[in-house]
Regions:
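Hydrophobic, proline/glycine-rich low-complexity stretches
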Residues: 1-7, 13
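N-terminal ordered "arm"
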Residues: 10-38
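Ordered, soluble secondary-structure elements with a strong preference for glycine-centered loop motifs
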Residues: 15-19, 72-77, 125-129, 186-190
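A domain-level signal for the structural core that forms small-molecule/cofactor-binding pockets
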Residues: 21, 94-97, 161-163, 170
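Short, charge-patterned binding micro-sites
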Residues: 37-69
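Non-catalytic RNA-recognition surface used by pseudouridine synthases
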Residues: 102-107, 111-211, 215-233, 237
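Single conserved hydrophobic/aromatic residue that forms the stacking wall/gate
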Residues: 241, 245-251
Length: 251
């Protein structure tokens, strides 16, 4: 059986890197008595894969990993068991049963929602209205949004406008806050800080990455009709009244 788990990450845990988070959840799953399947062979390991690695320093409400299990308790009991093993800064919020033919989350990721805000002690160079006018001028009203994208071996000009699905400016504690939905995944992956940095440059402003807190809200897959669906909605919750399920018994 395939299970998809959703979790939140905040506070000091935002400084824990992806590989350490993988090891953390491997231990947590074992201690929570989740009946996870192991690979075959001499160096057997848990069958677990994460959807989209989160950068160090970024908080999130929408992190995912998939596991294969032999049997499972209900969604409610499984979340409780996992959260009993969590430290402050990590909370499991979802646990759903996937179809037998479901693809791994990491291969499905197509987009993600982010909120970028100014950290305490840092001020925005523009007011909310000035940001809205600048984004309209340089992004929405422009036929393209060409930036220089650097790779390990080279750099090239890229029009990232088609890869930014949503971009708005909001107010939070009387400060501007940016909401973005951007292309994410193995094919076209755009980091939200890259977009904001490019906007700063178009406005002739100096960008300070230390001033910005990035928060990932959700991660999506793309359905056959082109619309987006959050990864958790691709599965079903396991009824709390059901008995412990195994691979030959599905509700």
């Amino acid at each position: 059986m395939k299970i998809r788990v959703k979790f939140k990450k905040w506070g000091c845990m935002k400084f824990i890197g992806h590989l350490d988070m993988m090891r953390y959840f491997q231990k947590a799953v074992r201690r929570a008595d989740i009946d996870i399947r192991y690979s075959e062979g001499y160096s057997a390991h848990q069958i677990m894969s994460f959807a989209a690695p989160l950068g160090v320093g970024i908080t999130s409400d929408g992190e995912y990993f998939d596991i294969d299990v032999n049997t499972t308790e209900s969604t409610e009991k499984s979340i409780q068991a996992l959260n009993a093993q969590m430290v402050d800064g990590v909370e499991v919020t979802g646990y759903v049963l996937l179809p037998d033919d479901a693809k791994k989350a990491m291969s499905l990721v197509a987009a993600a929602d982010y909120v970028l805000s100014f950290k305490e002690g840092y001020e925005s160079p523009y007011t909310i209205e000035e940001w809205k006018e600048a984004i309209d001028k340089h992004f929405f009203d422009a036929p393209s949004f060409v930036v220089m994208k650097k790779t390990k071996k080279s750099e090239r000009e890229v029009d990232i406008k088609p890869l930014v699905y949503k971009l708005t400016v909001m107010e939070n504690n009387k400060k501007p806050e940016f909401f973005m939905q951007v292309s994410t995944g193995s094919i076209d992956n755009i980091k939200p800080e890259f977009v904001l940095h490019a906007i700063y440059e178009k406005c002739g402003l100096d960008y300070n990455p230390l001033a910005i807190q990035i928060h990932r809200q959700e991660v999506y897959a793309r359905k056959d009709d082109g619309t987006l669906i959050c990864l958790l909605d691709m599965g079903e919750e396991i009824d709390r009244k059901s008995t412990r399920l195994n691979s030959s018994h599905r509700t």
